[in-house]
Amino acid sequence: MSVESSYDVVIVGFGAAGAAAAIEAADAGARVLVLDRGYGGGASALSGGVVYAGGGTPYQEAAGLKDSPDNMYNYLRQEVRGMVSDATVRRFCETSAEMITWLERQGARYRGTLAPYKTSYPTDAHYLYYSGNEKAWPYKLEAEPAARGHRMVAKGMSSGHAFFEALRTSAEGKGVEFEPLSRVHDLIIEDGAVVGVRYRTMESSAPGRRRHQRLSAVAGKLGNWVPPIGARVNARAEALWQANAVEKSVRATSVVLSGGGFVFNPEMKAKYDKGFEDISPLGTVSDDGSVINLGVSAGGAVDHLERMTAWRFMSPPSALLEGVSVGPSGARVANEDLYGATHSQVMIDQHGGRGFLVLDANIWTKARRQIKTQTLPFQRAMAAYLFSVGHKKAATLEG
């Protein structure tokens, strides 16, 4: 095992949060090392690249929307329901518009082109949209609806990748050092203080490094769409890493843990989220809970680990929201214009995770006509299934 030189700050995890922490530390004059078990980006790079921001951002104003920190707070406190302190929510709302300015300084780009319809994700014609429950009952009773979903300007589903690359470029331009394929397995603790980390890494000169990168890229794409195949490809990459990884350690004045969740850890899912074991994971294989466990090993506290979510969005096309969602008993699930995750949670909690959307012929025809203008290719594929074999038709509700 070789002992590396010390850094002011070591960050474990190089997604959007880790990159932001690295940038702030570098701006403060710190010497920064970032370790990531992948090649950087994490779930942030796979995401839609949407930042939730409000309180009067330039892009809200460009779209003719009125918002304020108080209005944003009145909405968000309904969403978090006490799981985040009022003080933290208030601070987030008050600094939200400033966050967009900060992101733009790092290279992120936004537009005030507002999507005029409810959608799970906007097309390339729109980069601002109602990304939550802002317009839905009962949320709109306490806060004036305002669109706050700011999507990074990029083509199709590349917004998340473009968003992270802007942060990566900014961090590396400020002198932040990055060591990929590095798995931290222990924190170095002396006299009750964390003073470094121990990790294994596959160095750039290691045999099979380029093949590992190719396999990881394929596994990352398949892991969310066809998990069994993605797992097999990842197993090959994992074998390469295990055969070539070497032990290292590094000391630091401060250690920041910035890893993902645990959706790719079957044991943790079974322990904390019974009933979700068979849900297809959304994220990367790095979301295995290892960084959470590192924090716990140093005395960190965790809470709400049982709060896993599974989604079924009903739009686009937006006309589908004019239908009625019902559970197996025929009872209505909830108002259809709720955010997809919110509506799905009610369906899980009260209807066993099963539901149906009932439409008449007029809504069906209207929705079909909206497919071309309201969908990106991945949404179009789902609509193609729905409008071909993914539905049942009858003259009456009785069938």
Language model: regions and residue ranges:
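Conserved redox-cofactor binding core of oxidoreductases
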Residues: C93-V246, P266-E267
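A short alpha-helix-loop-beta-strand transition element characteristic
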Residues: S44, M83-T88, G107-T119, A301-T309, ...
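Glycine-rich FAD pyrophosphate-binding loop
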Residues: D27-G48
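Glycine-rich active-site loop/strand segments that organize a redox cofactor
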Residues: Y52-F92
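An anion/pyrophosphate-binding glycine-rich loop and adjacent beta-alpha core
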Residues: I292, A301-G399
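N-terminal Rossmann-like FAD-binding beta1-loop-alpha1 element of flavoenzymes
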Residues: V9-V34
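Conserved Rossmann-like nucleotide-cofactor binding loop
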Residues: A17, G40, A331
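Glycine-rich loop(s) and the adjacent beta-strand/alpha-helix scaffold that form part
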Residues: S158, S205-F313
